[in-house]
């Protein structure tokens, strides 16, 4: 425990906040090109084939991003937009691909939560 005179001399050192999405460099989203599109399995106790893509960003970083929603049209050389946000059961996946932006199509036949999946409002009859 420091004395008051020590605090007057030095002061408290504030700890720097560590970014959860360092490759974005303080930007809300970044553009990149898919280098690999594949599926992977989650940590225990979950079981699935999660769709992920390895993306080379415009700032030179190469990151792993999650492709949310049912079905996708991504392949190698697809241009995508990524945002921050990790996937809890996939180690090393700290980014999400934005659906409905650039080369990534929105989710087809999506009725609820459409804005998160780039789905247009369905036509009323």
Curated annotation (Swiss-Prot):
Organism: Clostridium botulinum (strain Eklund 17B / Type B)
Keyword Ribosomal protein recorded: yes
Residues with the 3-methylthioaspartic acid modification: 89
UniProt GO molecular function: rRNA binding; structural constituent of ribosome; tRNA binding
Function according to Swiss-Prot or TrEMBL: With S4 and S5 plays an important role in translational accuracy.
PROSITE patterns xref list: RIBOSOMAL_S12
GO cellular component: small ribosomal subunit
Keyword annotations from UniProtKB, A to Z: Methylation, Ribonucleoprotein, Ribosomal protein, RNA-binding, rRNA-binding, tRNA-binding
Keyword Transferase belongs to the record: no
Subunit details: Part of the 30S ribosomal subunit. Contacts proteins S8 and S17. May interact with IF1 in the 30S initiation complex.
Family membership noted in the UniProt record: Belongs to the universal ribosomal protein uS12 family.
SUPFAM superfamilies: Nucleic acid-binding proteins (SSF50249)
Any single Pfam family the record assigns to this protein: Ribosom_S12_S23
Gene Ontology biological process terms in this record: translation
Lineage: Bacteria, Bacillati, Bacillota, Clostridia, Eubacteriales
Protein name stated in the entry: Small ribosomal subunit protein uS12
